[in-house]
Amino acid sequence: TTIYEFLGKRFGPRSRDAGTGFFMLTRLLASGVRLAGCAIALSVVFDIPLNSAIVLIAVVAFIYTTLGGIKAVIWTDALQFFLLLSGAIVTLFFIWSSMPGGFGEFFQIGSEFGKFKIFHVSASLSHPEFFLNFNNPNALAAGLLFGCFTTFAVLGTDQDLVQRMLTCDHVKKGQRALLWTAALNFPITLLFLGVGAALFAYYKVAPDAAVDGFIAAHHTDYIFPHFIKTVLTPGLRGLLIAALLAAAMSSLDSALNALSSTFYIDIYKRYIRPETTEKHAVTISRYSVIIFAAVLAIVAMQCGKTESVLWLGFTIFGYTYGAMIGVFLIAVLTDRRGNDIANVVIMVTSVLVVLFLTADSIGPLQGIRSTILSPLGIEQVSWKWSIIIGSVWTFGIGVIFSERK
C-alpha cells in the first residue's frame, strides 16, 4: 500500500495522481542529490571518476533492493545506521586527540569562528532577525518553521519514510517509531554538525592546500572524504570508508523500493493492468527498480556538477513538499470534501508561487517580483520559506475551493 491511496479515498483519483506525481518527482531529484553526495565521497577516497562511483552505488543498491524488497531495506539500513554513527563518533574523537590542545582547542576555534552559534540574532528581542526576516535564511522563524515543516513532510507525506511505518503490524508500533525518530533526530544532527566543526578546527591548526582549493571552488563536499583519505590511519580509514558505503546504500535502497511500490500500486495497477498475478507484480516491480536506478544515476551525474549538493537537496524539498503538506493537511485536519481537480491545480500553482518568490533568477518576471516585494522591505524571499509558503498556499486556497462533506 502507499500513502497516496488515502488522498484518492479522501478526495478522488486526480488528487491521488497528483500526490503520486509530486512524490516521484521529488524523490527522483532528492535521492539523485543524495546519490551524488555519497558518490563524491567515494570518488575522492578511491580516486575513481565521479560517474563510475555513481554507477557502482546504483548497481549495488539495485541488486539487494530487488532481491530482498522492503525487508532487506529496513534491516540493512538499521545496520548501516549504526555503522555510520560509529564512523562519526570515531572521527570526532580522532580529531580532538590529533589537535595539540585537544578538545579545548577545538572548542576555542569553533567559538571564535561562530561554529557553535545557533541563532543569528542581536541582543534585542525586537531585532527583526530574532524572529521574522524573509531575506535572511538564518532568522529564527525561518529555521524553526523550515525544520518543522520539512520533518512533517518527510515523515507524513513521503512514501520513502512512510513505507517503513506501514510495515508495522500495529498502529502503536508505527507511532513509537515516529517518536523515536523525533527523539533521535536532534542529537544525530548535532553529531554530524560537530564533525563539520571539528574538520574546520582541524584544518585551522593543520592547513592543507587541497582543502583551501576546495573552499575556493565552493566544493566543500570534497573536504571530509579528502580528510579520510589523507589523514586517518589505515584501520580508521577502513571504518570510515565502510560508513561512507553505508550512507550511500541507505540513501538509495529505500528510495528505489518506495518508487517501485508507488509506481506499481498507484500507476501500473490502476491504469495499465488492474488484474494481475503476484508473480507478474514482482516482475514489474523489479523492472521498475532497474529503471529508477538508472534515472537516479542520471540525475546524480547532473547534480554532481553543482557547487554544493547539500543546499541543492534542501532547495528541491522546498519547491514540492509544501504542496504535498497542504493537501494532506486539508485531508486530515478539516471536514471538507475537497475538490479533486482543484487540488491538482492548487498544488501546481503552489510550486509556481514558490518559484516566483524564492528562485534566484526568474527572467522577465524579476521586475514584477521587485515591485511586489520591495514595499515590504524584501529583496528576495529566502529559500527556507519555500516549503512554508507552499504549504500555506495549498492549504488556504484548497480550503476555499472545497465543500463540507
Stretch-by-stretch model annotation:
Residues 1-405:
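Membrane-embedded helix-loop-helix hairpins and adjacent transmembrane boundary segments
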